[in-house]
Amino acid sequence: MYQNLIISENNPEQVNMLMGEELYLVDETLWFEEIKSEGGNKFRFLNIVDHGNEHIIPESERDFFFRIITSIKNDKFTMDADGFSMINISQYRGVKWKNLDHLFSPVYCIFWGADPEKVGIHCKLWGGALQGNCRILYVDSIKEISENQEKKKQLWGLVKRMFQIQ
């Protein structure tokens, strides 16, 4: 029988009594041999979300996400469902960029509402970063962007630059 013995999760009020007024939570780094993903990753385009939904891409967000993905076309490739990978890091607490790089070897990466700091990447919201040879964007969640016309335009501008689309 599985029993969660972590005091801070079961009895958070007891933590203060045991530890005093200062409490430091340490985010332990974990290595995963496999991470569940959607897509074929042919063009090494990693998409990262962080939500408690059962599906990696919730049904309500699927249509908008695939419209964006299939709009990515340049002289090197035309993006499709086989061209990207999508993961939900909420199920992989403690995962770091080195682990993701090892498993997916991304050349392009978008954090959709998932804080890149969780995996050790420093990037501002609606900004970009370069990690090794991977171009990284950090934007709002798919749901937030799909409901806001200005954010859609802003996203498309960043995606065009990332993939060098004319």
Which residue ranges define each predicted feature?
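A polyanion-binding, active-site-adjacent surface
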Residues: 1-166
